[in-house]
């Protein structure tokens, strides 16, 4: 969907997702000498398009940048053209015609923001073990809508494959869910006091223990703090410190989602996952080349996949302890934790 006017047909243009009409407007705006700087919306008829000033602001909000616009054609003489060497012409054309598309990871950024906003409205600000586990069903529905929006061919998968993909992804999703928020507030989290940290741990399990099996706050810290320390220091913080840009983070999300190493997937589904992962890896590398990032950054993201997998194993261990202590966890979520996938 065009992030400027809302049109259904959209593609990657000048760094943002837009329809061809808005892309053409954006290009004309910078190549034309006429650049309206004042908003004229109040003087226009009710059903007309927004003025040039407002429309260009929407283009910027969609991520479009004038740096990606090729300069206009100059009127050059035949003599001037003949002076250009064949080698330099070939290199120039090669640089322009090789496409570096990153549509899937670019388009997913906006969808992820909508996904997170929807989750925030449903769950509110309070979070504890029961709320997190209970929300997994809604998270799976929203995740699949996002997947189909970008990879429509997966709508042909059998229900069991769709379900398996989502159930395989949920424990990983819980590991990375807080990474963007953590990255945006990293100084706050680095300087959190001991008392506040312990209070967060206690609040997460408070109220989800049956009255007949309460444990002291001291025991809660003793049992669960090692897990929190692991998630924070071994998973969330290392990824947050990478300062991933939106498309890079979405590449990480999709590489985790389309993990084809599970035995509960059909051969057809595993092949689809394998092919999509190739596309995502290619888009990620292309995006980083366009941004002039160091090549090591690509491999750091691949290493982040291993961090999340380690966090997933630790999380499953924590859930088993919660079950032994009769901490209230959604039964459906515990089925996801228990089932054999490898």
From Swiss-Prot:
Q: Which InterPro entries match?
A: Nhr-150, NHR-like_dom_sf, Nucl_hrmn_rcpt_lig-bd, Znf_hrmn_rcpt, Znf_NHR/GATA
The Gene Ontology biological process terms listed for this entry are:
innate immune response
Q: Which organism is it from?
A: Caenorhabditis elegans
Q: What is its main location?
A: nucleus
* A Pfam family the protein falls into: zf-C4
Task: Give the protein name, as stated in the record.
Answer: Nuclear hormone receptor family member nhr-150
PANTHER family tied to this protein: NUCLEAR HORMONE RECEPTOR FAMILY-RELATED, NUCLEAR HORMONE RECEPTOR FAMILY-RELATED-RELATED
Q: What does this protein do?
A: Orphan nuclear receptor.
| Name of the encoding gene | nhr-150
Cellular compartment(s): Nucleus
Q: Which domain of life is it from?
A: Eukaryota
Coiled coil as a keyword of this entry, yes or no, is no
Question: Any idea which residues the entry calls the DNA-binding region?
Answer: 1-71
Tell me the GO molecular function terms: DNA-binding transcription factor activity; sequence-specific DNA binding; zinc ion binding
* Record GO cellular component, one term: nucleus
The alphabetical list of record keywords is: DNA-binding, Metal-binding, Nucleus, Receptor, Transcription, Transcription regulation, Zinc, Zinc-finger
The record's listing under PROSITE patterns reads: NR_LBD, NUCLEAR_REC_DBD_1, NUCLEAR_REC_DBD_2
